[in-house]
Amino acid sequence: MGNGNSREAKESRRSRLRHKLQKFRIHRRHLRSSRNSAGMVIQRTVSAEDFSGIALLTLIGAEMKFKDKWLACVSFGEQTFRTEISDTTQKPIWNSEKKLLLEKNGPSLARVSVFETNRVARNKIIGYCELDIFDFVVQEPESTCKSFNLLDPTSSNVVGSIFLSCAIEDPVETERRFAKRILSIVDYNEDGQLSFSEFSDLIKAFGNLVAANKKEELFKAADLNGDGVVTIDELAALLALQQEQEPIINNCPVCGEALQVSDKLNAMIHMTLCFDEGTGNQVMTGGFLTDRQASYGWMFKLSEWTHLSTYDVGLNTGSSASYIVVIDRKSKRLVEELIDSKIVLSMRAIYQSKIGLRLMDQGAKEILQRLSEKQGKKMSSVESAQKIPRFLEFFKDQINMAEVKYPLQHFKTFNEFFIRELKPGARPIACMNRNDVAVCAADCRLMAFQSVEDSTRFWIKGKKFSIRGLLGKNVNPNAFLDGSLVIFRLAPQDYHRFHVPVSGVIEQFVDVSGSLYTVNPIAVNSKYCNVFTENKRTVAIISTAEFGKVAFVAIGATMVGSINFVRKEGEHVKKGDELGYFSFGGSTVICVFEKDAIGIDNDLLVNSGRSLETLVSVGMQLGVSTRTFARSTLI
C-alpha cells in the first residue's frame, strides 16, 4: 500500500509539473511569435529597467580626421574590452565584437573610446562616445549599423565618427539557444533530441544529486507529447521552469565550474558564453578594468600570457599601485585616476614606510608646510595661468569645460581656474523639496560607512584615527560617537567648491591646526600615518531637524593654499548651497552623522565595503534620514 501511495504521489508531482510546463510553453510561443527571424523582439513591451539578457556589440570601424594606427575600447560596468590595432589609416576597420550582460538594475551605459597608437610612451585618447545599450532594447534599430559622433574629451568638438551595431537577444531566444547547446553535449546520435539515456547523462553532468534521483520523473514531465524523446523546446521549457522553482544545474557542464544557484541569470549567461562559437568576427580582448589600462597595449599581452592580474580594485590597489581605480556612480563603470608616476613613488616612500614617517617627525612636516604655502602663492601669480592648458591636456577626458561658468580666457591665474564656478543647473540637487534626503557635498571620490568601525576596517588604516581626534578638542564629540562617516576626496582635476549636504543652521566653525599630508589613498591606507586627525582642518557643525547634528570637516592637504568658507555662523543653509572652496591641491571633506541618523544609499556602502571609491557629483543622493522614517511609522 505504501508503494501505491508513493507512485500516486510521484504521478501527482509529474502531472503538476507537466501542467506547468504546458502553460509555460504557451507563454513562450506567444513571446516567440513577436520575434522576427533573427530572434529580435519586434514589439517590445518590457521596460529597459526590467530587461535581462545579452547584447552583442560590434565595433565595425571609424572615420577619423587624420591618418594613424587606431584602437578602440569599450567600457561597460566593471569591465573594459579592446580591439586590435588597425593599420595606418584614416578609416580603421575592426569588426570586433563582445557580448555584454544586461542585468536588471545593472549598468547600461557603454563608453567607446578611440585612441591613436603612434606614440611610444602612451596611447592618446582622441575621441569618445557614450551609448545606452537599453536604447537598443526598447527601440527597433533602423539599420544593422549606426553611426555615432566621437567627441573630443576636453572641448566636446566632433573629431570623427564610429560605426557599430548592437543586437539584443531576448531572454526566450537565449533560453532556446542555451537548451540547443546543452542538448548537443549528450545528443550522441545527433538527431536533435534526447532519449532517456542521453537525458540521464545530461542530468548527471549538471552535478545535482537531487535532480539525478528524479531524472525519470523529470524526463516524463518534459516529454509533453509522450513520444519517448525530449526536443529542444521541451528541454528549454524544463530548464527555464526548473531554474525558477528548483534549480537542477549546480555545475557548468562545459567547464565544470560551480554555479551560484541563487543567481539564475548569471548562471545561464555563464554557460551560454562557455558554449559560444562566435560569429566569425574578431572578439575584443577583455580582462581590463578601464579604457586607459586597455590602451596600454603590449603590457597587457604580457600580463595575459603570464595569467597575472595586473590591475584590480580595492584597498591594496590604492596603496601600492601607480593608479587609483574608482567606479563612476552615474555610468556604473570603472575609471582610472591619473597620478604622475614620480609623485606616486615619492608618496609610497614617505607614507608606506616607517623610515619615511620618521623623516616626517624630524622636520619634513615643516618642509611640506612651507612648500604648500609657497606653491599656493605661486599658483596665484599671473604667470601661473600658463599652466592651465597643460593641466587640461593631462586631465583631458576628466574636465568638462562646457560646464564651467566662464570661458578659459576669463581666468588670470591658475588658482582662479582651480576654484572655477559651474554654470547654474550643472549639478542638479536630488529631492530638493525633501530635507530628509542628504546629498553629496562635492565632486569627488566617495567612501561611506555606517560606522567608524567599518571605516577603519575597510579604508582608514591610521592607528590613531577616532571621531574625537577628527573633530579636535574644541568640539564635543559625544553626539557623533559610533555615528556614520562619509569621506569626500577631491582630486586636483575636480570642481573644488564644496556644498552643504543637509538643510539646517550652521552652529559654529572651529579651526584645527595641523600638518599638510596628502589625502591620497596611498597615505590614507597607511598604518603609519594618521592623515585625517593630524592635517589642518576646519569643523562646521550643522544643526538639522531631520538628521540631528552633522559635523562637516574640511581637511587641507599637500599643496592646498587655504580652506575658504562663504557662509557664517548662525546662517540657515539649504542642501546644495555652496559652503566654501579649497585653493590649489588635493583635499577632502568628511561628514559625520549621529548614530542611526542616516541610512546611506546601499550602492555606496557596497562599493566602500570593497574598498572601492565611488565617483560622485555634487547633489547626488547620499542617503535618507532614518529618524524621519521612524517618526512617520509611529504616526
From Swiss-Prot:
Name the cofactor(s).
pyruvate
Question: At which positions is Ca(2+) 2 bound?
Answer: 223, 225, 227, 234
Per the UniProt record, the site (Cleavage (non-hydrolytic)) maps to 586-587
Topology in the lipid bilayer: Peripheral membrane protein
Biological process terms from the Gene Ontology for this record are: phosphatidylethanolamine biosynthetic process; protein autoprocessing
**EC numbers:** 4.1.1.65
InterPro entries per UniProt: C2_dom, C2_domain_sf, EF-hand-dom_pair, EF_Hand_1_Ca_BS, EF_hand_dom, PS_Dcarbxylase, PSD-B, PSD_type2_pro
Q: Where is the active site?
A: 443, 499, 587
Picking any one GO molecular function of the record gives: calcium ion binding
Cofactor annotation remark: Binds 1 pyruvoyl group covalently per subunit.
Briefly state the modifications made to the protein after translation: Is synthesized initially as an inactive proenzyme. Formation of the active enzyme involves a self-maturation process in which the active site pyruvoyl group is generated from an internal serine residue via an autocatalytic post-translational modification. Two non-identical subunits are generated from the proenzyme in this reaction, and the pyruvate is formed at the N-terminus of the alpha chain, which is derived from the carboxyl end of the proenzyme.
Q: In which tissues is it expressed?
A: Highly expressed in flowers and at lower levels in leaves.
Q: Where in the cell is it found?
A: Vacuole membrane
Record-annotated residues binding Ca(2+) 1? 187, 189, 191, 193, 198
Q: Which UniProt keywords apply?
A: Calcium, Decarboxylase, Lipid biosynthesis, Lipid metabolism, Lyase, Membrane, Metal-binding, Phospholipid biosynthesis, Phospholipid metabolism, Pyruvate, Repeat, Vacuole, Zymogen
Keyword Kinase annotated: no
Q: What happens when the gene is disrupted?
A: No visible phenotype under normal growth conditions.
Q: Which residues carry this modification: Pyruvic acid (Ser)?
A: 587
Q: Which GO terms describe its cellular component?
A: plant-type vacuole membrane
Family affiliation: Belongs to the phosphatidylserine decarboxylase family. PSD-B subfamily. Eukaryotic type II sub-subfamily.
Assembly and partners? Heterodimer of a large membrane-associated beta subunit and a small pyruvoyl-containing alpha subunit.
The UniProt comment on domains reads: The C2 domains have an essential, but non-catalytic function. They may facilitate interactions with other proteins and are required for lipid transport function.
Question: What is the recorded function of this protein according to its Swiss-Prot or TrEMBL entry?
Answer: Catalyzes the formation of phosphatidylethanolamine (PtdEtn) from phosphatidylserine (PtdSer). Plays a central role in phospholipid metabolism and in the interorganelle trafficking of phosphatidylserine. Contributes only to a minor proportion of PtdEtn production.
Matching HAMAP family, A to Z?
PS_decarb_PSD_B_type2 (MF_00663)
Protein name stated in the entry: Phosphatidylserine decarboxylase proenzyme 2
Q: Which organism is it from?
A: Arabidopsis thaliana
Taxonomy of the source species: Eukaryota, Viridiplantae, Streptophyta, Embryophyta, Tracheophyta
Provide the gene name from the record: PSD2
